[in-house]
């Protein structure tokens, strides 16, 4: 999974 995807998920 892309790192940026996780940031947009958890760091909303």
Swiss-Prot record:
Catalysed reactions, as listed in the record: Eliminative cleavage of polysaccharides containing (1->4)-linked D-glucuronate or L-iduronate residues and (1->4)-alpha-linked 2-sulfoamino-2-deoxy-6-sulfo-D-glucose residues to give oligosaccharides with terminal 4-deoxy-alpha-D-gluc-4-enuronosyl groups at their non-reducing ends
DNA-binding found in the keyword field: no
Annotated keywords: Heparin-binding, Lyase
Field pH dependence: Optimum pH is 7.2.
Transmembrane segments: none
Enzyme Commission identifier(s): 4.2.2.7
Activity regulation behaviour: Inhibited by Cu(2+) ion, lead and some agents that modify histidine and cysteine residues. Activated by KCl and by reducing agents, such as dithiothreitol and 2-mercaptoethanol.
Thermal dependence of activity, per record: Optimum temperature is 45 degrees Celsius.
Top-rank taxon, per record: Bacteria
Post-translational modification note: The N-terminus is blocked.
Enzyme category, top tier: lyase
Disulphide-bridged cysteine pairs: none
Recorded GO MF terms: heparin binding; heparin lyase activity
Role: Degrades heparin and heparan sulfate.
Name of the protein described by the UniProt record: Heparin lyase
């Amino acid at each position: 999974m892309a790192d940026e995807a996780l940031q947009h998920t958890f760091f909303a």
